[in-house]
Amino acid sequence: MMLVNVRYFKPQLNGYAGNAFTYKTALPLKVGDRVIAPTRGGDNRAMVVEINVPEGRVDERVMPLLREITQYDAEEAQA
């Protein structure tokens, strides 16, 4: 399992922007991969902006709450 940072897709900008959010994943992701990121409000399209994030950079209180990315963005992959 590795930690990655992603930025969410912003339709109004037609791109990926904003703060980076940390997720765990077992997928062999690379920077630039498009994925589906689960959030409290539902699934969001996102782009991986950093891989192999050290656990020390994530607040230990947040670690048990991290959600897992389990799929690539199929819509983006078909484009």
Q: Where in this protein do the model-derived segments appear?
A:
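Terminal, basic amphipathic appendages of nucleotide-handling enzymes
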Residues: 2-79
